[in-house]
Design a protein with these regions (language model features):
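A short LG(V/I)-centered, amphipathic sequence patch enriched
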Residues: 54-71
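Flexible hinge/capping segments at coil-to-helix
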Residues: 171-187, 191-213
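Hydrophobic hinge/microswitch elements
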Residues: 149-153, 218-275
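Secondary-structure junction motif
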Residues: 115-122, 165, 198-201, 205, ...
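Short helix-boundary/capping micro-motifs
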Residues: 24-42
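Central regulatory/effector-binding core of bacterial HTH transcription factors
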Residues: 103-167
Length: 315
């Protein structure tokens, strides 16, 4: 059963934000007893609240067993709505309640871009408080989409270009997400400052073929459409997959490897050893953000977007 339509008519529902918080906590803990302890309520009270919510919504959110609980498919859909409602409630309280004791919260999932990290640093510094809970996830493309769709992240940062745009745009639409372009970039190569091609102003694909092509692993969705690099591994004879930016740059230095990206690189963050060179390739990257459709962004998200625009203004 889907949650859209008559089965999710909640006009006369007594559903509360507290119930939604219970639902999300149980899903995170995967155990009713542990969730009850975390929420400081009794296990029977928590079980009753979850059952009441399931009955109201007409869904079975969890499958119970001696080992704990697991989320059903319709439960995942309900959780996505719950996380978004809780996030919007937090944003509303943050905007209208003059409560300085409220903990600042913000989460963003992104591809491996230095400007995304720099913008995150700006937000933390701007809203520095005695306590806060900020999350930055440099992760795989598919997980970025999942994180934003399921309410784990308020924003996602990724890119589109001619070969992945149709596939990813369909995914955005399916998950009720919208893409907003931040800037356009021409393709560049990241290489070591001591690379044999380091003195070239422009580098061709043919010149790169003797060297290892370094790409970010995409897990189960390891198709060209989810790649962070717009140059297919099929075009290069030597390929190495990595999970993090530090490893990629170490291999670029140690093996004279290369990767392709936007050309935006930060020497303070990545050091002086990695340089950017223009790639002789007719292609344009559209780097932007994804967010849930029709949501109000938190002040932290708005500041983050403004900061990204500042860090990429020279592109």
């Amino acid at each position: 059963r889907g949650l859209v339509g008559s089965e999710m008519c909640i006009r006369d529902s007594a559903m509360t934000l507290q119930q939604l918080k219970y639902l999300v906590t149980v899903a995170e803990c995967k155990n009713i007893t542990e969730a009850a302890e975390k929420l400081f309520i009794s296990q029977p009270s928590l079980s009753a609240a979850i059952h009441n919510l399931e009955n109201e919504m007409g869904v079975t959110a969890f499958v119970r067993s001696n080992k704990g609980v697991s989320v059903t498919r319709e439960g995942e859909e309900l959780l996505s709505f719950a996380r978004n409602l809780l996030e919007q409630a937090d944003i509303m309280k943050d905007r209208f309640c003059n409560d300085k004791s409220r903990m600042p919260k913000f989460s963003v999932s992104c591809q491996h871009y230095s400007f995304a990290v720099n913008a995150f640093v700006d937000v933390v510094n701007k809203y520095d408080a005695n306590i806060y809970s900020f999350i930055l996830r440099e992760t795989q493309t598919g997980e970025i989409i999942d994180d934003v769709a399921n309410g784990r992240s308020e924003l996602g940062i990724l890119y589109l270009f001619e070969h992945n745009e149709d596939v990813l745009t369909k995914l955005f639409k399916k998950n009720d997400l919208v893409f907003e372009e931040i800037f356009k970039a021409s393709p560049h190569v990241f290489i070591s400052k001591n690379h044999p091609l380091a003195n070239n102003d422009i580098i061709t694909l043919e010149e790169l073929k003797p060297y290892p092509y370094l790409v970010y692993e995409q897990g189960k969705r390891n198709s060209f459409y989810f790649s962070e690099e717009f140059l297919s591994v099929l075009d290069m004879p030597k390929n190495i997959q990595v999970r993090d930016r530090a490893t990629l740059f170490n291999l670029a230095i140690g093996l004279n490897g290369f990767t392709v990206s936007s050309g935006v690189i930060d020497k303070e963050l990545n050091g002086e050893d990695i340089i950017s060179k223009k790639l002789d390739m007719d292609c344009t990257m559209r780097i932007g953000l994804i967010k849930k459709k029709n949501i109000i962004l938190s002040r932290y998200a708005i500041s983050y977007i403004d900061s990204i625009k500042k860090h990429t203004a020279i592109v």
